[in-house]
């Protein structure tokens, strides 16, 4: 299962002509959050941020922090160009983390230098940044590599297997591709005919609530649009979003309950049936395995040798 976080690489920097940093970051946040909402019928906004207002605030926060990051080669004017590019991006590009070329810049920091954002680095990637105050400039994990602590390359997603609690960089399957528990499909497609031991095939998904569905023979339902195939009614139903402490997973009536601005956790790690834990606030306690996670863009930085830590907001220290 994917936690469905789309990582937006912020490459803002100081300087530029005409537009202010505040205006550029407001416009970028608006473009990104509008795309997040329109590509998911609002479901991705609720899942990651809880509300559009919080999406705008937290996305802008990422941008304004990056303005002060050393080594960043971009300008507020460039962020305006990036905002326009995100407005014209396809939903597949957005949901698969395929950042527009107009949003990518190479910074001045060499490999190995401390960083928080890819735009600081000559490689345009900041690695090992997920569970630390500072990462280091370098290259992202290879396809199939572990992404527990590093973001994947553009065009790849970090897939979480809730059975093994591992995180791997993958590319979702196109129409007709083999699919299964650890091989999901592109947005707009559903995995049909898969079992616990046998893969199925990616097929076009139904895109509206109330449409007929069948996970064995097709069509399935578009999960990226917040839909779930209720096997009891054989129709696509809208995913429900629950608050902290509520049960998550498939209900007795066959509907699916996910977590609003949070993640579903079992006794150990993430799961598809468990209890919701809302993402923790900046500075609050977190746990990289048992939750809660932190409110984006904060990172859970664990104490040495443990999984328990504190939600750290980038910009608290200079990297």
Say what each PLM segment does:
Residues 96-97, 116-133, 150-165, 182-198, ...:
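Extracellular, cysteine-rich, disulfide-stabilized repeat modules with beta-strand cores
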Residues 22-57, 61-62:
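Short N-proximal segments of mature Sec-exported proteins
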Residues 45-105:
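Compact alpha-helical subdomains of small soluble proteins
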Residues 100, 105-118, 134, 138-149, ...:
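Secreted/surface-exposed cysteine- and glycine-rich disulfide frameworks
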Residues 21-26, 75, 79:
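Solvent-exposed, acidic/flexible segments
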Residues 15-17:
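Bacterial signal peptide processing site
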Residues 1-12:
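Sec-dependent bacterial lipoprotein signal peptides
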